[in-house]
Amino acid sequence: MLEFMDYVQFAFYNATKWNYENSYSQLTATAKGLLDFETPGGLRFNLSSLSSPNFATSYALGSVGLVDGSLSYLYSSLPLRTTAQSAKIDLHEIIRGYRQIQELRRVDEPWMLEQWHGGRRIDKRDTLLYGRLYLPQSTLEALYLRRITPTQQVRITAVSDSRLRNGGTILALHQYDTGKYSTETLYSTDGGLLGLRGLYNFGPDPRKEVTEPPKQMPRIDDKFYGRFSAGAELYYGTLNKSGGVSVGGRFATLPAHRGIPLTATLTLNPLMGNISSTYAVRAGKNLSLCSRLDFNVYSYESDLVLGCELWKMRAPVEERRERSMEAKLAWRLDEVDLEKEKKPEEVAGVLKARVDQNLKVGLVWEGRVKELLFTLGTSIDMKRRDQPFRALGLELQYSS
C-alpha cells in the first residue's frame, strides 16, 4: 500500500498530465506490484493530512526492535484537488497490483499552458517540494520536482546521512516524454554515475491527428488490442570505471481488448548474463496471477516466483423501502426501477500472496476498517519447521 506522501505525488503527476508509466523504469511495474510487495515488520502508524491544496504533512511512528519515526512535509505550487480522507480514498489508487496499460494520449502543446495578463506572461512552472526526516537516525531525504514543458520534467532527489560516503548523495533525472517514446538522462554523485534510458511504443503515434475517417470494416469482437514496447538502459560509473546495459520488451493488452487482460515482459542484462521474464494475467474480475523466472546464462542459476492478488468486495446491502400510499390503496407493490444506477462495489480487502522456489512465502492483507487503512502481513519460511514465521507486522494509516 502506498504511503500518503507517495499518493499525493501521484496526484501531482495526474494534475500536471504527466504519464509516469511511460518510462523504461516502469517496464515491469505490474510484476513488481504483484510479486515484490513489502511485508510489514512490527507495528507502525502513519498520521497524515492535506491541510490545504498546496501543503501536506505526515508523521510516522514505528516499533521494530526500537522506536523510530519520521516527519514529512510536501509543498505543491499547483493546487491538488484529490481525496485525502482515508475513509474515502479509493483503494485501487493506493494498492499497487495489476496495472492496466492505458491508451497513449497526445501531449499538450506548449502554448496551451501560457497565461497572459496585461501583455505579460504570468504562468509559472509547476513545482513540487518534499522533505522527510528520519528519527533517531537523523537521515534527511529531499525531492525537487519541476515541470519544464509539457514534454519535459526535472527530478532531483537527495539523501543526507553520515553513514553514507561523503555524507550523502544526489540523483538528478531529466525526463522527456512525447507519448510515442520517452527518454531519461540521469546523474548520481554516488560513483559519478551517468545513465540513459529510453522506451519506444510501437503502433499509432498520438502526436498525429487522424484526419481521414476510418474505413467501414466489419466488427470483429475477438480482435486483439495490445501494444508492444521496447527499451534499453545504459549507465557508466566515471569513478569506478564500470558500466552496464540492459534491454527489455513488454506486451500488454489495452482496455479495448475484450479478452483476458495480460502483460508479458522480457529483460536481458548481457554483461551479467541475467534473463528475466514475467507474465501477469487478470484471470477474473477480482483475481490476478503473476509469475517471474530469472535465469543466469553464466552460472545456470534460476529463480522462480509465483504470486496472486485477490480483491474481496463487500456484499451489497439492499435498502428497505416502505410501500407508497398509492401502492397501499391499490393493494399492490411499488414498481421496481430497473434503470436506477447501481452503486459501485465497495472493497472489503485485498489479499496478496507469493511463493518462491525456496518455499519462502509472503502474505499481505490490505483494506480499510472504519477510517483507518491497514496492512497486515507476514513472511514464512516453510523449510524452517522450528521457526517458520520470520516476520509479522501491522501498519495503520489515517489521513484527513
From Swiss-Prot:
Please list which residues make up the signal peptide: none
Is the Transmembrane keyword given for this protein? yes
State the membrane topology: Multi-pass membrane protein
Gene3D superfamilies, sorted: Porin (2.40.160.10)
State its location(s).
Answer: Mitochondrion outer membrane
Keywords recorded for this protein, A-Z: Membrane, Mitochondrion, Mitochondrion outer membrane, Transmembrane, Transmembrane beta strand
What's a GO cellular component annotated to this UniProt protein?
Answer: SAM complex
What's the entry's take on its domains? Lacks alpha-helical transmembrane segments, suggesting that it resides in the membrane via beta-sheet conformations similar to those predicted for other outer membrane proteins and porin.
Quaternary structure annotation from Swiss-Prot or TrEMBL? Component of the ER-mitochondria encounter structure (ERMES) or MDM complex, composed of mmm1, mdm10, mdm12 and mdm34. Associates with the mitochondrial outer membrane sorting assembly machinery SAM(core) complex.
The molecule here is called Mitochondrial distribution and morphology protein 10
Organism per entry: Sclerotinia sclerotiorum (strain ATCC 18683 / 1980 / Ss-1) (White mold)
